[in-house]
Amino acid sequence: MLTLARQQQRQNIRWLLCLSVLMLLALLLSLCAGEQWISPGDWFTPRGELFVWQIRLPRTLAVLLVGAALAISGAVMQALFENPLAEPGLLGVSNGAGVGLIAAVLLGQGQLPNWALGLCAIAGALIITLILLRFARRHLSTSRLLLAGVALGIICSALMTWAIYFSTSVDLRQLMYWMMGGFGGVDWRQSWLMLALIPVLLWICCQSRPMNMLALGEISARQLGLPLWFWRNVLVAATGWMVGVSVALAGAIGFIGLVIPHILRLCGLTDHRVLLPGCALAGASALLLADVVARLALAAAELPIGVVTATLGAPVFIWLLLKAGR
């Protein structure tokens, strides 16, 4: 028994090391790739100082943090709602953040500062997450809870579409492209949003014990002495915060929070002591690679990263649904 535990521990360490190496390689590729390829040897030249340190580095850091936040949010929501299909985009949390941001643009007539828009996006995500938690407390089946989340997402999407369609504001019309997801406008001025993600990410990665209990189910977690009300509300707040900040930085990006935790679980990373940091590393790597594809796929324009993740993630999502139905 002890030998099996040690083997599992060594395997977990190997997975985390491999994911760390993958993330570092994706980070280097993101800094080098672009309209002009700049190798690491040229990073400290005047050209490298402009393109790498002033343009690509803040974007790369934002992609890394958002990818980690979305993947961890997916893992947390799947444990919290006891639903393997739960993730911020599918359950409408990302769209809720978008509604909050668009409401801020409308009410502020485009005059609100970026920090106020970010806070409104966070508030919108929190409201939708709290509504979902309210549904969860009514002991709905997992399929009904999933449908409730999808319905909330559709309502939020309809509200955003109506607002953009009837708006005469140039800023609001530009949000239509922004809501497809993209890091094109990220620079060092958004560093406060990046910093707002770091403490929550680190804190959640340290909460493996309550997450493992939640993954066992509500009854088992209560029998083990876990204060469910406290942890549900704290994790809801943390997840809403991460999703809101991510939407404020880059718009709505789907499938990262759904696919990454599933893939890692299929690889044997079921313990949240390994799953949570693994999701952070794998989510960051996946979004960094998707961002490189978004930048390089077209010569004269940049693809919205939400389109790239949806194109790559939708087939995986369908495969997971078929696999779960067997």
Curated annotation (Swiss-Prot):
This is Vitamin B12 import system permease protein BtuC. It is found in: Cell inner membrane. The keyword Cell membrane applies. Belongs to the binding-protein-dependent transport system permease family. FecCD subfamily. Part of the ABC transporter complex BtuCDF involved in vitamin B12 import. Involved in the translocation of the substrate across the membrane. Keywords: Cell inner membrane, Cell membrane, Membrane, Transmembrane, Transmembrane helix, Transport. One of its GO terms (cellular component) is plasma membrane. HAMAP family: BtuC. The lineage of its organism: Bacteria, Pseudomonadati, Pseudomonadota, Gammaproteobacteria, Enterobacterales.
